[in-house]
């Protein structure tokens, strides 16, 4: 004979994995072609010279060189890669 009332089941207990977004290479760092510079949602940072953008807005280097973050007007930022 049970002396404890059955406990209800909870609907919590899940947590999704982190998506690991953010800047991967900072200004002044040297990169090789294909290196990921920024993982982002939307164009928080725009691609500059020698930088490509993937379909998920990932910015990557097209050449070997040095990373430089620049302002594009008053409210936009962009990242470029210049030959070392």
Swiss-Prot record:
UniProt-annotated stretches for the region Disordered: 1-25
GO biological process per UniProt: translation
Highest taxon of the lineage: Bacteria
Keywords for the protein's UniProt record, in alphabetical order: Ribonucleoprotein, Ribosomal protein
Database matches in InterPro entries: Ribosomal_bL27 (IPR001684)
Signal peptide segment: none
Entries under SUPFAM superfamilies matching the protein: Ribosomal L27 protein-like
A Pfam family it matches: Ribosomal_L27
GO cellular component: cytosolic large ribosomal subunit
Recorded GO MF terms: structural constituent of ribosome
Xref: Gene3D superfamilies: 2.40.50.100
Family assignment from sequence similarity: Belongs to the bacterial ribosomal protein bL27 family.
Name recorded for this polypeptide: Large ribosomal subunit protein bL27
Upper classification of the organism: Bacteria, Pseudomonadati, Thermodesulfobacteriota, Desulfobacteria, Desulfobacterales
Gene: rpmA
């Amino acid at each position: 004979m049970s002396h404890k009332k059955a406990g209800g089941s909870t609907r919590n207990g899940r947590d999704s994995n982190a998506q690991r977004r953010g800047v991967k290479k900072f200004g002044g760092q040297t990169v090789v072609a294909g290196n990921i510079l920024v993982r982002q949602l939307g164009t928080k940072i725009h691609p500059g010279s020698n930088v490509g953008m993937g379909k998920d807005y990932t910015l990557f280097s097209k050449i070997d060189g040095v990373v430089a973050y620049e302002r594009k007007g008053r409210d936009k930022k962009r990242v470029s890669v210049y030959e070392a």
